[in-house]
A protein has these predicted regions:
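Terminal amphipathic alpha-helical/low-complexity segments used for targeting or macromolecular assembly
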Residues: 1-59, 178-206
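Short arginine-rich
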Residues: 33-35, 166-170
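Flexible, glycine/small-residue-enriched loop-and-beta-strand segment within the central core
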Residues: 43, 65-151, 176-177, 182-193
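Short-chain dehydrogenase/reductase
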Residues: 138, 156, 172-174
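Conserved catalytic segment of ABC-fold P-loop ATPases
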Residues: 152-155, 168-170
């Protein structure tokens, strides 16, 4: 099996294989080009995003700069996905992001890992595991999602959290390692930051 065929199998492989590196260089040049498109050219930005990423739903926006190992080629975006500055996609294998999900500044989604054994690691070997993030999630600033993690729908991940295990739907989760803090519920329909009251009209206004 060729090394590039192991990108999506979870097997240990050699990422510096010439075929992989050649394609990766082309894709990373596209990221560099995207990062230099002026904000006053939104149509060009959207067009290039669709060229780079595996899938892009309607009304997606990624602030610049962003970074992607494979240029976003293995990233699947639903509709209305927003990413703030400094998004890092270690997209050596697939990353799936659901409709309406938002990322704060400097979020990292890392699908790649390396063997713990120092001999194997010194050879530059790695493996990749996919990341799945559900619909209507909010990942706060500086969140890191590790290889193989699945995050359910309607989840809030607190800023600075490191997500090493799956997170179920409908919860607030925080910490290092990230753990479920509580359920998202009726209280959140009435109150926001430090129990400030929400105007009920907001649900109909926007």
């Amino acid at each position: 099996m060729a090394e590039k065929e192991k990108l999506h199998t979870g097997e240990i492989y050699f990422p510096n294989d010439p075929d992989i590196m050649r394609q990766q260089g082309i894709w990373q040049d596209m990221v560099m080009e995207y990062n230099n498109i002026p904000h006053v050219q939104p149509e060009r930005r959207e067009q290039m995003l669709r060229q780079m990423f595996a899938e892009v739903g309607e009304n997606c926006y990624i602030e610049t700069p962003f970074y992607a190992n494979m240029g976003g080629h293995h990233v699947h975006l639903g509709k209305n996905v927003y990413a703030n500055y400094g998004l890092t996609l270690v997209d050596d294998t697939h990353i799936y992001i659901g409709d309406g999900t938002m990322f704060g500044p400097h979020v990292t989604l890392a699908t790649a890992g390396h063997p713990i054994d120092p001999v194997l690691r010194s050879k530059g070997l790695q493996y990749n595991m996919p990341i799945h993030i559900g619909r209507n999630c909010w990942l706060g600033a500086g969140v890191i999602v590790m290889p193989g993690v699945t995050i359910g729908d309607n989840v809030v991940i607190g800023a600075g959290s490191i997500v090493t295990k799956d997170i179920p739907s409908g919860v607030v989760a925080v910490g290092n390692p990230c753990r479920v803090l509580r359920q998202v519920g009726e209280h959140d329909q009435k109150f926001y930051y430090k129990d400030r009251q929400i105007d009920p009209e907001l649900f109909e206004k926007y």
